UniProtKB/Swiss-Prot annotation:
Protein name according to UniProt: Large ribosomal subunit protein uL2
Transmembrane segments: none
Source organism phylogeny: Bacteria, Bacillati, Bacillota, Clostridia, Thermoanaerobacterales
GO BP annotations, alphabetical order: cytoplasmic translation
Region spans: Disordered: 225-274
Range of residues in the leader sequence: none
Subunit structure: Part of the 50S ribosomal subunit. Forms a bridge to the 30S subunit in the 70S ribosome.
SMART domains xref list: Ribosomal_L2 (SM01383), Ribosomal_L2_C (SM01382)
Family annotation (PANTHER family): LARGE RIBOSOMAL SUBUNIT PROTEIN UL2M, RIBOSOMAL PROTEIN L2
Amino acid sequence: MAVKTYKPTSPGRRFVTVSSFEEITKTEPEKSLIVPLKKHAGRNNQGRLTVRHRGGGHKRMYRIIDFKRNKDGIPAKVVAIEYDPNRTARIALLAYADGEKRYIIAPHGLKVGDVLMSGPDADIKVGNALPLANIPVGTLVHNIELYPGKGGQLVRAAGTAAQLLGKEGRYAILRLPSGEMRKVLLECRATIGQVGNLEHENITIGKAGRARWLGIRPTVRGVVMNPVDHPHGGGEGRSPIGRHPVTPWGKPTLGVKTRKKNKASSKLIIKRRK
């Protein structure tokens, strides 16, 4: 895929870059695999704001994605590559030999007409899913399970890939896109290859309005608020923060570690992220 730029015909157009969408082969989603997606604007089940800067945006339908890849031994043909508004990656529509259709995250290099397989006996080929125990060391993988049978949770964003560095006892050792090295059970499944839509990192939103189309609301700095709204607020004119930076709720921020000290999974992390 390529990134499209525009002539600066207006201030809003000047820095905008968009995907060319040239890999997309089908514009309407598969009707049996979509469900309505309700907007929550960052509110939880009590109606309280738990995630800031969310709200508005274009209406979306949720595409049901097969993260488990548990349909073993049945070949699936790639019917289409589609756009998904709910993620940065593209999605691929698979038609299985028994008639079932499923969406998966589209890996880089996957084309319409390719035939994919899942299961321990699948070939080492882009788009095939198999347990880490059956994948050769050095292979790039994505959509990795943390718990066997739960479905892929790691490495699902556009252009990402993890590398299988080795196997030790019951665990595989992976290098994740963040730089973290961690152990994952060998029974956990992963999909071969790198996630597609590699150029996503080069896209510039370019104007505030386009962020609003995506459901992203403005981020107001605490230092420009009043003291009632933020610990950094107040002062005459343009004032410095005047203390160690804190969140709106008074917790230390900017460079402070937020990971729980005694988290059970810490023993599986060999090297923390950069």
